[in-house]
Amino acid sequence: MNLNKNLPTGTRDKLFREAQAAYKIEQQVNHYFEKRGFKRIETPVIEFEDVFSSEHQADAKLYRFFDEKGRLTVLRPDMTLPIGRVVSTTGVMLPLKLSYSGKIFRANEDFGGEQNEQTQAGIEIIGYPSIKAEIECILSGIGVLNALEIPNFQIELGHAAIYRRVIQLLNLSETAEIDFRQLIQNKSLTGIKRFVANNPSTLDDFILAIPRLFGPATAILNQAKSLTTDKGILTALREMETIVEAVSYTADISVDLGLVQDFHYYTGIIFRGYADLAADNFLSGGRYDHLLEQFTSSSSPAVGLALNLDSLTTLQNRAGIIKKQTPTTLLIHYDLEALPQAEKFMQETPNSELSFFETASNAISFAKKWHIPEVVHVSSQGIQTILQREVD
């Protein structure tokens, strides 16, 4: 089968207006992070598989291939682990505030509707144990969404320590933990009720309530505190309360105590961003204080935020925010000996471009086809208008 006209699963072309909008969004996001004091970092698209082979990345669906020396390499499925590699191996001084943007690749299943190639931008705050690092990530995410004029978005908070504490007390096998994780993610009331009956613990009331513990932050957190006396869970709930109180003035903040991230490296506060016009989250992040241990014997506290720029481009388009590209209003046909004058005239004339046709008649035909209202001819004799008309 000849595939030279097809694209791999989960990839797509972007043309003209969409491509320009995606480019501008990436610029805006990077500029916003720069204004907040973040330093840009870039890592290769290709990494050795070992960077992503830890238990933290067990669920990642990788594009794998061998290099010329037979070593297994992958296309990066996220940016966090490569940045962890850089920080751990280059000897840069902590603490750090880093920003990035670039492509990531995940080999999702066919017909799942997910994009295997995504443009991602984000920040990593490394070396700050304070809760102010989480607050900075959330404020930065909210600031970006406001700068991009994303309408009706909301930030949802969770805490990885809640799920970890439940798993620790239940002492589940790996298979049982996977099943339980799925029940939590699906908010399956019936499934969790059956699970609790088969795995009784001191957290029964809390676990049974997890599928319903999402919504307005203050009410849900108060309800959750009334369902458990476990110190670990209560500490996590208090951290969530602190963050809600700190950032709620900036955006609509909700909580979901059943929020479980796809990557296992999160240890503390986790968060996502949603909007009315989006089917899935386009912002995610959280704290992962042990991630760097994969690359070095010491650990460093870290918090990260990632934005799916492709989803944000789609959101802007649905909201009618993306502006039409400025049309060409003047086509400049020129004789070769008059190229310097034509180039100077183009530089001084907004929304103009040079014609590449040999004859003036072809330039005029092109202008009519593409609704360009005016054509001039630049020669050694000067500049002459050869087409001028109104365009609907």
UniProtKB/Swiss-Prot annotation:
Gene Ontology BP terms: histidyl-tRNA aminoacylation; L-histidine biosynthetic process
Matching Pfam families: tRNA-synt_His (PF13393)
Primary location class: cytoplasm
Protein name: ATP phosphoribosyltransferase regulatory subunit
Pathway the protein acts in: Amino-acid biosynthesis; L-histidine biosynthesis; L-histidine from 5-phospho-alpha-D-ribose 1-diphosphate: step 1/9
Cellular component aspect of the GO annotation: cytoplasm
Highest taxon of source: Bacteria
GO molecular function: catalytic activity, acting on a protein; histidine-tRNA ligase activity; transferase activity
CDD domains: HisRS-like_core (cd00773)
Assembly description: Heteromultimer composed of HisG and HisZ subunits.
Top-level taxonomy: Bacteria, Bacillati, Bacillota, Bacilli, Bacillales
